UniProtKB/Swiss-Prot annotation:
Family assignment from sequence similarity: Belongs to the Fe(2+)-trafficking protein family.
Function: Could be a mediator in iron transactions between iron acquisition and iron-requiring processes, such as synthesis and/or repair of Fe-S clusters in biosynthetic enzymes.
Gene3D superfamilies xrefs: Fe(II) trafficking protein YggX
GO cellular component: cytosol
Pfam families hit by this protein: Iron_traffic
Gene Ontology MF: a single term: iron ion binding
Species: Buchnera aphidicola subsp. Baizongia pistaciae (strain Bp)
NCBIfam families named in the record: PRK05408.1 (NF003817)
Protein name per Swiss-Prot or TrEMBL: Probable Fe(2+)-trafficking protein
Length: 87
């Protein structure tokens, strides 16, 4: 990945269904992280981060707990991809 080309790159954001500024880094490990990098805009990712904080606090999740980690990952997939796409 060339950092110089990552700045201000435009992608078609699957969250907003339009071209938006892409992320400058892969925000999550594995194939899911690459999918987010390629298909989710910086603005959509920031919306998820805010939503994630709300979910963790309301459901009193512990991010050191593997079950809670998997739950928040599932919430993230549903939020970002509207549960319409297979990973």
């Amino acid at each position: 990945m060339n950092k110089k080309n990552d700045i201000n790159r435009k992608i078609f954001c699957n969250f907003f269904k339009k071209y938006e500024e892409g992320l400058t880094y892969i925000p999550y490990p594995g194939l899911l992280g690459h999918k987010i990098y390629n298909e989710i805009s910086k603005l959509a990712w920031n919306k998820w981060i805010l939503q994630q904080t709300i979910i963790i606090n309301e459901k009193k999740m512990n991010m050191l707990n593997k079950n809670d980690q998997k739950k928040i990952e599932n919430y993230m997939i549903k939020f970002l991809f509207k549960n319409k796409q297979q990973l």
